[in-house]
Each structure stands twice: as C-alpha cells, then as structure tokens.
C-alpha cells in the first residue's frame, strides 16, 4: 500500500521516514485563504482540520494524508511567520509562556471514498530565552516556515522547556493519530513499512 503525503513539509516526511514509511510526496496546491473563507468563527481545531481535509482531497492517491498545524497562544492562532522580523516578534511574545500546537490530520482512503479526521492538541512550555538567542535563531532561517516559529527536532529544541503530548505531533504529524486512521480503515501501520 502506498501512502501519499499531501504536503511539501520536510518535517512531516522525516517523521514518516523515521517510522519506516516512504511516502509519495505531492504538493496539494491548496490556496489556504480561499479554503477557509467559508468558515464562520471556526475554533482553532475546526480551522486546522478544514485545511488538512482540503489538502488530502486535493491530491490523488490510494491513501492520502493531509495535515495542518498552527500555534494557539494568547487566544491567537498563528501559522508560519515567513519573515525574520515576524519570527522575532512572535518569540518575544511566546518566550516563557505555555501554548498549544493544534494539528489537523485527514486520511483519505480511495477504496472506500471516506476520510478519517482527527485533531491533536499538544501543550508546549516555551523556555525563557534571551533576546540574543531569539535574534540568532531567527537569523538561521530555520523557524521561518514552521508553525509557531519553532522546531522541536533541530535548533528550536533549545527553546522548549517541555511538551505534553506525542513529540511527532509537534514535529508535524501525530503517529498515534495516523495509526488510529489506519485502524479506522482496517489497515495496519506495518502495511506502510517500506
């Protein structure tokens, strides 16, 4: 069985690779602003799940996995910062605070035409870090294309005090959620091992 990852995220691909899965990787090409335009006052979970589902439905494949992650902090849902300046601003806001990384998962099974959806929320305690560390981290470029402006598995690990949840969910997709989705369709995760 071939899993198609409806994402260009290197982090999501690495999570799958480390778990023995070599997915076919396809950019979903979803206009995220247009995809959520019809939502009225969505919760953070509804927002990320809607995007994850749109991505899974946009790609052809036997079994397609879509995902989307955003950071909920101080009542604000944040995606990727994209710029060094925005990264610094966000880190000034989030250092020393607790936040929630909300990740939507959508697994589309072509054989049944059904989709399994699950949102996973992971609590993150950010470290109280210096202005110098924030500036240096932003300058590396690493956090610019990451939800919440951080990574767990690389330089961003220095900025995390603790997490409450599965580490794979923080990196990009929850392996437990994927396992539950596979179970839902009657597959075993070992079917994906390449």
From Swiss-Prot:
Disulfide bonding pattern of the chain = none
Q: Where in the cell is it found?
A: Cytoplasm
User: What is the top-level taxon of the source organism?
Assistant: Bacteria
Database matches in HAMAP family:
Maf
In its UniProt record, a GO molecular function of this protein is: nucleoside triphosphate diphosphatase activity
InterPro entries from the entry?
ITPase-like_fam, Maf-like
One Pfam family here:
Maf
Q: Could you tell me the keywords of this UniProt record?
A: Cytoplasm, Hydrolase, Nucleotide metabolism
List the catalytic residues: 68 (proton acceptor)
Which Gene Ontology BP terms does the record give?
Answer: nucleotide metabolic process
* Major localization class: cytoplasm
Gene Ontology cellular-component annotations: cytoplasm
Enzyme Commission number, as recorded: 3.6.1.9
Q: What is this protein called?
A: Nucleoside triphosphate pyrophosphatase
Which cofactor is recorded for it?
Answer: a divalent metal cation
Protein's job: Nucleoside triphosphate pyrophosphatase. May have a dual role in cell division arrest and in preventing the incorporation of modified nucleotides into cellular nucleic acids.
Q: Which reaction does it catalyse?
A: a ribonucleoside 5'-triphosphate + H2O = a ribonucleoside 5'-phosphate + diphosphate + H(+); a 2'-deoxyribonucleoside 5'-triphosphate + H2O = a 2'-deoxyribonucleoside 5'-phosphate + diphosphate + H(+)
* Homology family: Belongs to the Maf family.
Q: Which PANTHER family match?
A: BIFUNCTIONAL DTTP/UTP PYROPHOSPHATASE/METHYLTRANSFERASE PROTEIN-RELATED, BIFUNCTIONAL DTTP_UTP PYROPHOSPHATASE_METHYLTRANSFERASE PROTEIN-RELATED
């Amino acid at each position: 069985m071939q899993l198609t990852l409806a994402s260009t995220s290197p982090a999501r691909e690495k999570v799958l690779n480390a778990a023995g899965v070599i997915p076919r990787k396809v950019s979903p090409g979803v206009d995220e602003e247009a995809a959520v335009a019809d939502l009225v006052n969505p919760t953070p979970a509804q927002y990320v799940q809607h995007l994850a589902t749109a991505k899974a439905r946009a790609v052809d494949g036997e079994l397609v996995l879509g995902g989307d992650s955003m950071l909920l902090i101080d009542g604000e849902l944040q995606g990727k910062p994209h710029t060094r300046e925005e990264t610094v601003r966000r880190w000034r806001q989030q250092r020393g605070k607790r936040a929630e990384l909300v990740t939507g998962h959508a697994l589309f099974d072509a054989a049944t035409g059904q989709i399994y959806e699950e949102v996973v929320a992971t609590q993150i305690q950010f470290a109280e870090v210096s202005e110098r560390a924030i500036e240096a981290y932003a300058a590396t470029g690493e956090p610019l294309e990451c939800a919440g402006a951080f990574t767990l598995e690389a330089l961003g690990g220095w900025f995390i005090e603790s997490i409450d949840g599965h580490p794979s969910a923080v990196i990009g997709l929850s392996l437990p959620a994927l396992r539950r989705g596979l179970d839902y369709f009657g597959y075993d995760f070992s079917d994906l091992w390449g």
